[in-house]
Design a protein with these regions (language model features):
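Flexible cytoplasmic inter-helical loops of multi-pass small-molecule transporters
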Residues: 8-14, 200-209, 241-263, 478-490
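Extracytoplasmic gate region of multi-pass secondary transporters
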Residues: 52-57, 271-322, 326-329, 422-423
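Helix-to-loop junctions at the C-terminal end of transmembrane segments
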Residues: 94-108, 328-340
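Cytoplasmic membrane-interface "Motif A"-like loop-to-helix N-cap segments
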Residues: 105-116, 336-350
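Cytoplasmic helix-loop-helix junction between adjacent transmembrane helices
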Residues: 140-178
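Helix-loop-helix hairpin linking two adjacent transmembrane segments in secondary transporters
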Residues: 165, 174-243
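C-terminal transmembrane helical hairpin of 12-TM major facilitator-type secondary transporters
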Residues: 341-388
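A late C-terminal transmembrane helix in Major Facilitator Superfamily
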Residues: 396-435
Length: 531
């Protein structure tokens, strides 16, 4: 497509969009090696994120004995633990956008290496200095959050560059299991490594003994040093195995590996489908995080007689619902099999399943209703985790590596933004529930009513998300263009295309002399072709 073209007919743009999305190049064999290396470091990093829940039943009493009783900490221990976990999400939101810029400057491999190093430093800092003070503990959790946030953007970018449209959804969906796999692994390993606490009824009293305190400290450190070691090993594997596709070897996908001006990505993001995808994903994260927060207590309150003697069962059932992101490759595989004009259906169905999950889970009157709730929760997770993140490079990939990185960085902001929004709402509901009856002007309301309020809030939230999922459907012009046989394509694989902006197409966002290369290249010597 000529760089001198300032305005193009919208039909020409739709045709190029159709050519990009309908292209099915063969995927290079080494792409699967690159995916493995990226996935390995990516599942190691969330282990640092979830380094605390597996030891929470021991860590919180330790915090009480070490900081609350001596008067060194005035925060409620449960709230203090929550801040340690939420620090990751808040930090990830802050670093997501700069990460897109960093990828544009140095590329995905160096950026992911930096992410791994920062996470390892944060985790090692926790292991070494967590007992100094709560503020020190929190500071190293923030450092860990920087690494997690960078990985959430860089990992799928590194994978997307290797895979063609034919396999990209499943490949990115495989990468998207990074959090469920890392979370499940460390949440099962941590209790085993801290099993010395088994059979101790009074944990706080146990920890009042200085000798026992030292034992507890060493056990926490064992878990956290293990996580640090796993990150380091995975990082070495990534450094050795991952590389960018080589055009000389014929390793070409539809997405160009050129790193362009940061602003060149923005026209590709001003797109109805992208906006619908972002909002639907944020509201899905809101509801899913609410499930994680409230489900166990809700289930126990609804059916207390069912869990006598099997207190672990509610938590196990909730784990099944929230860890089912491991099955995300199924959603990616289904998306790969669908025509490009039908891929949006997976996102819509996923949101609709979450809507049904809320309906069945809201004040259920029989346990079989919970079965339906759990089913729709799992199906919704599988479909959305397996399709939303891969959809970003599919929608903005014509802008090359830079557009993909920026798009995924914005998706990360919306993802963690949904979780933080849920935290605000839950705090607001909890504060309202804790008010004195005289302060709210009516008779005392049982706590279960406020628990139901949480579920009532989720219903309109996911309904709105389902409506926005409809916006990911291709336009009528694109659907019509996909039906008609096209002549020889103007767009070529790996080419940076001209962005769509309403009914007109603005001037191409970059010129040849704006392409970032490893060595200094004069503008007059820059190649005319972008492939």
């Amino acid at each position: 497509m000529s760089e001198s073209t300032s305005k193009l007919d919208v039909n020409e743009v739709v045709k190029d969009q159709t050519e990009f999305m309908s292209s099915e190049l063969p995927t290079p064999r080494y792409a699967w090696v690159a995916l493995f290396a990226t996935w390995l470091i990516s599942i190691a990093i969330p282990m640092a994120w979830f380094a605390l829940p597996g030891v929470a039943s021991r860590l919180i009493p330790w915090m009480v004995a070490s900081w609350v009783i001596p008067g060194q900490m005035t925060l409620d221990p449960g709230a203090a633990f929550g801040f340690l976990m939420n620090a990751i999400a808040w930090t990830a939101i802050i670093v997501a956008i700069p990460t897109g810029w960093i990828i544009r400057r140095i590329g995905p491999k160096p950026t992911l290496i930096i992410s791994g190093i920062i996470t390892a430093v944060g985790m090692a800092g926790v292991a070494l200095f967590f007992n100094v003070s709560y503020e020190t503990f929190l500071a190293f959790r923030v450092i860990t959050g920087i690494g997690v946030g960078m990985c959430s953007v860089t990992g799928p970018t590194a994978v997307s560059l290797w895979f063609s449209n034919k396999h990209r959804f499943m490949a990115v969906a495989i990468w998207s299991t990074w959090v469920p796999v890392g979370m499940l692994f460390i949440n099962n390993v941590s209790p085993a490594l801290t099993s010395f606490m088994a059979g101790v009824d009074d944990l706080a009293g146990f920890l009042m003994n200085p000798a026992n305190m030292a034992v507890a400290t060493s056990q926490f450190q064992t878990v956290w040093w293990l996580i640090t070691a796993i990150i380091v090993v995975a990082l070495i594997v990534f450094i050795v195995l991952y590389r960018l596709p080589s055009i000389e070897k014929g390793e070409v996908s539809e997405i160009s590996i050129e790193r362009l001006d940061y602003k060149s990505a923005f026209p590709f993001l001003k797109n109805r489908q992208v906006v619908g995808l972002l909002i639907a994903w944020m509201l899905f994260e809101f509801v899913n995080f609410a499930f994680t927060t409230y489900d166990e207590a809700f289930l126990t309150a609804q059916f207390p007689e069912m869990w006598v003697g099997i207190e672990w069962m509610p938590a196990f059932l909730m784990t099944c619902g929230n860890a089912c992101g491991i099955l995300a490759p199924i959603g990616g595989w289904i998306s790969d099999k669908l025509p490009w004009t039908k891929k949006w259906i997976i996102i819509f169905v996923g949101c609709f399943c979450l809507l049904l999950a809320v309906v069945f889970g809201w004040k259920v009157g029989a346990f079989y209703f919970f079965g339906f709730y759990l089913l729709f929760h799992i199906v919704g997770n599988v479909l959305l985790v397996g399709s939303v993140r891969p959809m970003v490079p599919f929608l903005v990939g014509r802008g090359g590596q830079t557009a993909v990185a920026v798009g995924l960085s914005i998706l990360t902001v919306f993802q963690f933004g949904g979780e933080c929004l849920e935290t605000f709402v839950s705090y607001a509901i909890g504060a309202f529930a804790s008010m004195d009856a005289s302060a709210i002007g009516h008779v005392a309301v049982p706590p279960e009513a406020f628990q139901m309020t949480t579920w009532a809030v989720m219903l309109p939230i996911i309904a709105i998300g389902t409506a926005f999922a409809l916006l990911t459907r291709p336009s009528k012009a694109e659907r019509e263009a996909a039906k008609s046989p096209a002549p020889a394509p103007d767009w070529q694989p790996g080419e940076i295309d001209v962005p769509v902006d309403g009914t007109e197409v603005a001037e191409a966002p970059v010129q040849a002399d704006e392409v970032i290369v490893e060595e200094e290249v004069d503008a007059d010597d820059a190649p005319a072709s972008r492939s």
